[in-house]
C-alpha cells in the first residue's frame, strides 16, 4: 500500500469512528510506525 492509499484509508477510518482512534492502533493496522501515522495525519490536516 502506498502513502496516498494509506492516507485515504486513515481518513475513512477516522470519519467512520465515533471516538478518537489512537495513532498506535492505526500504526498496527497498517504495519507502520506511529511516527509515520503522525506524519500522515499532518499531511491530511494540511490538505483539508
Residue spans of the language-model regions?
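Short, basic/aromatic recognition patches that contact phosphate-bearing ligands
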Residues: 1-48
Amino acid at each position: 500500500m502506498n502513502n496516498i492509499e494509506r492516507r485515504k484509508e486513515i481518513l475513512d477510518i477516522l470519519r467512520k469512528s465515533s471516538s478518537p482512534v489512537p495513532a498506535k492502533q492505526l500504526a498496527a493496522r497498517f504495519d507502520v510506525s506511529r511516527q509515520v501515522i503522525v506524519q500522515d495525519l499532518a499531511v491530511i490536516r494540511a490538505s483539508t
